[in-house]
């Protein structure tokens, strides 16, 4: 399931599994998280959306001659359209509040585990 947490890493994960022979390129279906809303990829601030778009575009280019049914390619394109179709960055304060709650319960620090998402706090 594609969420804010793994949005930067899904292409790398997909490619690694293909290269390891664990997965055929077209045997990939992206399920876009809908709830809770504050974990959705359309919550990312615009600058971070552009970074994710670049990663997905690069991955799609790599997949072009490998995904004969275009199933994975269409999934990544769909995720890109979903992410850019709506600006829900107004939910960033809810995201941070809920991450803080989870961090307190788990005795963890979300932004240490996902440092690439640290900049979200600047937009909350």
Residue ranges and their predicted role:
Residues 1-124:
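Conserved C-terminal portion of the radical SAM core fold
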């Amino acid at each position: 399931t594609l969420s804010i947490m793994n949005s930067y890493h899904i292409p790398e994960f997909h490619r690694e599994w293909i290269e390891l022979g664990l997965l055929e390129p077209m045997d990939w279906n992206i399920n876009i998280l809908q709830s809770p809303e504050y974990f959705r990829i359309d919550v990312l601030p615009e600058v971070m959306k552009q970074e994710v778009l670049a990663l997905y575009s690069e991955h799609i280019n790599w997949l072009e001659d490998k995904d004969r049914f275009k199933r994975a390619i269409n999934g990544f394109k769909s995720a890109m359209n979903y992410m850019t179709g709506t600006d829900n960055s107004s939910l960033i304060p809810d995201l941070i509040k809920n991450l803080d709650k989870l961090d307190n319960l788990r005795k963890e620090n979300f932004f240490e585990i996902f440092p690439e998402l640290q900049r979200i706090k600047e937009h909350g």
